[in-house]
Amino acid sequence: MDATFWAFIALVIFVAIVVYMKVPGMIGRTLDERADRIKKELEEARTLREEAQQLLAEYHRKCKEAEKEAGDIVASAEREAKALLEEAKRATEEYVARRNKLAEQKIATAETDAINAVRASAVDLAVAAAGSILAEKVDAKAAGNLFNDALAQVKSHLN
């Protein structure tokens, strides 16, 4: 029996002890557990990746919605500003037109008042001149006749 034989026997005994102690099963279970743990980690990583992609897609969607909403707000503000500007312009034009009309009415009233004042002054002047001329040239008898004629004219106009 040489050394190779004893080495073979030792190897067989060692393998028998390893099998008796169920080392291959423990190694298998350990490897299976590790494989399961790796599978779970891969599945969890896949799930996290999908969630991240969903969150990214949602973020992009919300970003686009926010941009659209901001654009709508700007467009609405521009429309409102334009409407306010047009309303202010229209109101200013109406105000100017009213003020012009009022000024024209005041001018027309002042013109009418001035014409009436001139006429009244002319009538007063004519009456005063006629009175002074009549006072110089008409005697009492002629004044009575003139008064009677004037009274007759007034009566004829009133009837």
Curated annotation (Swiss-Prot):
One of its GO terms (molecular function) is proton-transporting ATPase activity, rotational mechanism. It is found in: Cell inner membrane. It is a single-pass membrane protein. It comes from the Bacteria. GO terms for cellular component: plasma membrane; proton-transporting ATP synthase complex. InterPro entries: ATP_synth_b/b'su_bac/chlpt (IPR002146), ATP_synth_F0_bsu_bac (IPR005864), ATP_synthase_B_chain (IPR050059). The chain crosses the membrane at residues 1-21. Keywords: ATP synthesis, Cell inner membrane, Cell membrane, CF(0), Hydrogen ion transport, Ion transport, Membrane, Transmembrane, Transmembrane helix, Transport. Belongs to the ATPase B chain family. F-type ATPases have 2 components, F(1) - the catalytic core - and F(0) - the membrane proton channel. F(1) has five subunits: alpha(3), beta(3), gamma(1), delta(1), epsilon(1). F(0) has three main subunits: a(1), b(2) and c(10-14). The alpha and beta chains form an alternating ring which encloses part of the gamma chain. F(1) is attached to F(0) by a central stalk formed by the gamma and epsilon chains, while a peripheral stalk is formed by the delta and b chains. F(1)F(0) ATP synthase produces ATP from ADP in the presence of a proton or sodium gradient. F-type ATPases consist of two structural domains, F(1) containing the extramembraneous catalytic core and F(0) containing the membrane proton channel, linked together by a central stalk and a peripheral stalk. During catalysis, ATP synthesis in the catalytic domain of F(1) is coupled via a rotary mechanism of the central stalk subunits to proton translocation. This is ATP synthase subunit b 2. It comes from Brucella ovis (strain ATCC 25840 / 63/290 / NCTC 10512).
